[in-house]
Amino acid sequence: MSDVLISEFMDEAAVADLERDCSVTFDATLVDDRARLLSSGAGVRALIVRNRTRVDRELLARFPDLRAVGRLGVGLDNIDVDACRESDIAVLPATGGNTVSVAEYVLTGIFMLRRGAYLSTPRVLAGEWPRQALMGHETQGATLGLVGFGGIARDLARRAQCLGMQVMAHDPFVPADDAAWQTVERAERLATLLEKADAVSLHVPLSEGTRHLIDGEALATMKPGSLLINTARGGIVDERALAASLRDRHLGGAMLDVFEEEPLTADSVLSGVEGLIATPHIAGVTHESNERISWITVDNVRRALGVRA
């Protein structure tokens, strides 16, 4: 039996450091073997996961000694937070650990999609020379719209402003008198932001209130030729409506790192859609961020278990 069970990949140096204070089982294959995971709960006081391990009531019932769930990241939709609270189990996200990675990912997507030239390698190597078709747009002076204005969005806003972008944000949970609005235009209505922004980036959790927040009506409201980038959670965007908007060329492009079903299947509604860049839920995952969130999580777990921090 181990004090700590780790079911997904994690920085090995951080794991080794945790082993100085706790007995640890580190098995990144457990996420793909639910039965084996559920049979591994005896004596485990802390479980460390990423976004694929489902921490639900079924799992909690098989981990009777569990006191903490360390989340290697910030999204909590794979964790039944209410069930954990009822059992007095601490849920410990690695807040701030992947902020830089996500912000850089979003800005890269904006540059790639607005300029339009970076994915031309096959055509150029085939002898085409489509200079006029790939002329694209500069990003300086463009307006970035942020849906949600938490820590990652605020860091992204600062970086975008340094590049000469105008930034506006919509977040009904940030009071109008919050100091965060001093440097960013506040859009009271989501529709106002969608109408004005040249690029829209999503930074909200998935909930009943945000499921399909960006639906067909919202996409139609967006500025013609604008971009949509989703690094938040699949389900916030209606993928069928997005595919239609891209095919109709109302949107200028989209970059999705998260999807309603992961991984995608060959018959996805997004298959064959031009103007789309798709990545496998990796916006927040770099070598540097993996180290940061691993060490943050190790410290969080140590504190929760009352050992050296």
Swiss-Prot record:
One Pfam family matching this protein: 2-Hacid_dh_C
GO molecular-function term, one example from the UniProt record: S-sulfolactate dehydrogenase activity
Domain of life: Bacteria
Lineage of the species this protein comes from: Bacteria, Pseudomonadati, Pseudomonadota, Gammaproteobacteria, Oceanospirillales
EC numbers, comma separated: 1.1.1.310
PROSITE patterns membership: D_2_HYDROXYACID_DH_2, D_2_HYDROXYACID_DH_3
Segments traversing the membrane: none
Biological function: Dehydrogenase of the (R,S)-sulfolactate degradation pathway that only acts on the (S)-enantiomer of 3-sulfolactate. Together with ComC, provides a racemase system that converts (2S)-3-sulfolactate to (2R)-3-sulfolactate, which is degraded further by (2R)-sulfolactate sulfo-lyase. Specific for NAD. Also able to form sulfolactate from sulfopyruvate.
Keyword terms: NAD, Oxidoreductase
Name of the encoding gene: slcC
Protein name (Swiss-Prot/TrEMBL): (S)-sulfolactate dehydrogenase
Keyword tRNA processing: no
Family classification: Belongs to the D-isomer specific 2-hydroxyacid dehydrogenase family.
Active site: R233, E262, H281
Catalyzed chemical reaction(s): (2S)-3-sulfolactate + NAD(+) = 3-sulfopyruvate + NADH + H(+)
Signal peptide: none
Protein residues bound to NAD(+): G151, I152, D171, T231, A232, R233, D257, H281, I282, A283, G284
Natural source organism: Chromohalobacter salexigens (strain ATCC BAA-138 / DSM 3043 / CIP 106854 / NCIMB 13768 / 1H11)
CDD domains, per the entry: PGDH_4
